[in-house]
Amino acid sequence: MRLISAKKFAKDGKIRFKEFYRNNIPSYAILSHTWEDGEEVTFEDCKPPVAKDKKGYKKIQNTCRLAIGDGIDYVWIDTCCIDKSSSAELTEAINSMYQWYQQAKVCYAYLSDFQGGNLKDCRWFSRGWTLQELIAPKIVQFFDRSWKNAGDKMSLLKQLSAVTNIDAGILSHQVPLSSACVAKRFSWAAKRRTTRDEDLAYCLLGIFNINMPMLYGEGRKAFTRLQEEIIRTTNDLSIFAWTWRGSWDGRPYLSFLAEGPDDFTWCSNLTLRTDPLVNEYEMAITNKGIHMQGPHWVSEYKDGAIRYSLSLQCANKDEPHRPILIPMRKAGPNIFMRAAKSGRMDVSLGITSSYPINSKSFTLLTRLPREQLTSGSLVSIFRHVAVAVEFPSDVPKLGVHGIPQKHWDVEDAVFFGPDSAVRRWGCVRPSGMGGEMLVCFWHKSNNDWEFQGTILNSSEEGMDGLMQDLFVFAEALDYPAEVVEGVLRRHGVRVGQKSLQVRYGGKKFRVAFTVERVNDRKICFGPHFKIKVSRLPID
């Protein structure tokens, strides 16, 4: 750490540095301020007479004067104590910045545009770097444009909390910073700005106790990297609680990672419902996106829509019993995109009922493929072949269960698969009917696709073993289609059966299905079979 000798500076106005290392760093004062373009004294400017010609020289003068008055021999100022021509030194400094402010004996916050009035109008509260400079040090003394004392952090605590939306307990160090969920911490940086896009991420490293290399030139990718590093260190799902704040361009789906702190503006009142260390989720960054272990949900909305959703294990502190869920769109085998609606995320609003899907794992996409397609939709390009199943209108949509779950999309009520010669299968069983169940097979043959369906009654005597084989073993062990067909035959099922009689509510019905080849690029990019199941009473 490179420090300025305050006493030597006071004697002759020359900036002299002394380097210290972790075990022998003396007490020091630290300056927090907003930079003036071209007027700050940099490390290269410290040799006279260049330094004295810049306005920033007075900041060094006053910081040293205040430090000497407080009995402190050394000061640290970000403009001149870092050799920014050295990328290694700059990286070390930025990664250490929070700790340096935290360990300072006192922090002098110079508000260059404050001369009485309302603190919230000061530029200091709108800059990215000053966020950690307010939180990290225990003692912060504020000075107006004339370097007159304007109060300290404790005397201004209530006002500072109101201006920044940061809990007073965190500002006063009575409550640990880690007690605030990830989304809440991001919300403190909302509407703050930095000169360079990358610094919107780099200025938050200390807030999340993260270290990562500096890559100036990467632009907003820095904020993506920051979120990925946070995910590597915590299971706090509130990181997905952001809402889209950019210009709405009609995109129906988004990445699961936010584009910047502004997306977290609404999250200042969020609180965790469970400790991330003991919640039922695990997250890992992969080359596809975020690999999740834990449940996700199927939710029904007031408008009748069925959507997948992810519970974020957090809630608004004013509604602690209402968990926040975000809608998802299934794009591939247990692969999800984030669904958007009318330019903002639908966070549990309008949900009437939900049930969990306890899949082994699923993936949240952090990068989407081509956003503009000449035909079809972003969903359909993941599906080369689809089998849609339509049941009578009185069958509740939320009660239709399909396996394998990874190839069944509840929202569209379709099985989907890739362009492959491998034979595929799917089994769908609705609640609210007479026990009927549809098993489907499809495969590519001679450059075309063939479909075969079998309808059976799962409530018949002796079917318990079949149900276990299909809904437990076939699902868990990922049976291929040939094995599933063998299971059906072993249990006496006539493969290819297209109709049967069932008893439901004391009446007899004939249940049958029809197969139609359709073309719907919104559902599927390739072959699309539409299966319509009918149920007619038998007199």
Model feature map: region roles:
Residues 16-21, 86-89, 109-123, 192:
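Intrinsically disordered, low-complexity acidic/Ser/Thr-rich segments used as protein-protein interaction/activation
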Residues 39-96:
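General structural concept
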Residues 21-27, 100-103, 123-124:
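Extracellular/periplasmic catalytic domains that process cell-envelope and extracellular macromolecules
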Residues 16-24, 63-66:
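Short amphipathic alpha-helices and their capping/turn segments at secondary-structure boundaries
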Residues 31, 67-87, 101, 107-113, ...:
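Short acidic catalytic loops
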Residues 32, 61-69, 95-98, 102, ...:
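Amphipathic alpha-helical interaction motifs in eukaryotic regulatory proteins
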Residues 56, 90-93, 97-100, 127, ...:
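Alpha-helical interaction elements in eukaryotic regulators
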Residues 3-11, 27, 34-50, 70, ...:
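Long, low-complexity, serine/threonine/proline-rich intrinsically disordered regulatory regions
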